[in-house]
Amino acid sequence: MTKQTEYKRKPEWLKIKLNTNENYTGLKKMMRSKNLHTVCEEAKCPNIHECWAVRKTATFMILGAVCTRACRFCAVKTGLPTELDLQEPERVADSVVQMGLKHVVITAVARDDLKDGGAAVFAETVRAVRRKNPFTSIEVLPSDMGGVEENLKMLMDAKPDILNHNIETVRRLSDRVRARAKYDRSLEFLRRAKEMQPDIPTKSSIMVGLGETREDLIEAMDDLRANNVDILTLGQYLQPSKKHLPVLKYYPPAEFAELKEIALSKGFSHCEAGPLVRSSYHADEQVRSAKEKTAEAK
């Protein structure tokens, strides 16, 4: 057996129990009927069955289903995006009502074709959800919106409950993994978000298994903490197709536990770490934990 073949074989701890009960099928039908997209489907998230069938949660993906970037880890389609759908914010808000969500995550494809990076529609989606669901906490997961401060301000002025922006990988691998996004630009984005709205928790995520070292990961944690990021998620990279970057290492659960302890020792208010953890995984629990610790610190 070659080393490359060995890398492609998933270990036991990554095997997922599929659950397609009425919650799952009902949620899928609702998304289709409202012409909405979820990152759960578009990015081939391994937790879709747990979230849709058991937890009845979903991460809405706005601004279309075609991304202007072509990150080498991501399964979302790339190309020329469609025109903006200005009715999308209301449909998302109505879906949150229909689902009875206590916490909603709203993400988007990168829209480098737009001057504001999609910030106006993103902000309006937050406001629409807030109007119709005043007791639902709202987490936003935008791209870097070109690193333009005015675009970020537009989104932060809508007052989401949590701002999530992923650095995705360590500094040493960033240019290879996501060539059109920049590591330092993402850190700056997170720093500015905290400066604009100090009471809104910030969050970021790192994939592992792309060739990073323990030292690389610790450096990334330090970089995030230096920019006042509150919450960290760590999960296993899984290759979506043969066209994407290969998995170079499968981290066992015990190693994720070690990384979580390191992250918490760095001062993160919450760290979710595990083979199947993704940025939005158990997001409601993450934001609740962060807010409780912020309140305790005051």
From Swiss-Prot:
Database matches in PROSITE patterns: RADICAL_SAM
Record has Magnesium as a keyword: no
Catalytic activity: [[Fe-S] cluster scaffold protein carrying a second [4Fe-4S](2+) cluster] + N(6)-octanoyl-L-lysyl-[protein] + 2 oxidized [2Fe-2S]-[ferredoxin] + 2 S-adenosyl-L-methionine + 4 H(+) = [[Fe-S] cluster scaffold protein] + N(6)-[(R)-dihydrolipoyl]-L-lysyl-[protein] + 4 Fe(3+) + 2 hydrogen sulfide + 2 5'-deoxyadenosine + 2 L-methionine + 2 reduced [2Fe-2S]-[ferredoxin]
Subcellular location as annotated: Cytoplasm
CDD domains (UniProt xref): Radical_SAM
GO molecular function: 4 iron, 4 sulfur cluster binding; lipoate synthase activity; metal ion binding
GO cellular component entries: cytoplasm
Domain of life: Bacteria
Binding site for [4Fe-4S] cluster 2: 67, 71, 74
Keyword terms of this UniProt record: 4Fe-4S, Cytoplasm, Iron, Iron-sulfur, Metal-binding, S-adenosyl-L-methionine, Transferase
E.C. number(s) listed in UniProt: 2.8.1.8
SMART domains, per database record: Elp3
SUPFAM superfamilies for the chain: Radical SAM enzymes
Name listed for the protein in its UniProt record: Lipoyl synthase
Organism: Bacillus thuringiensis (strain Al Hakam)
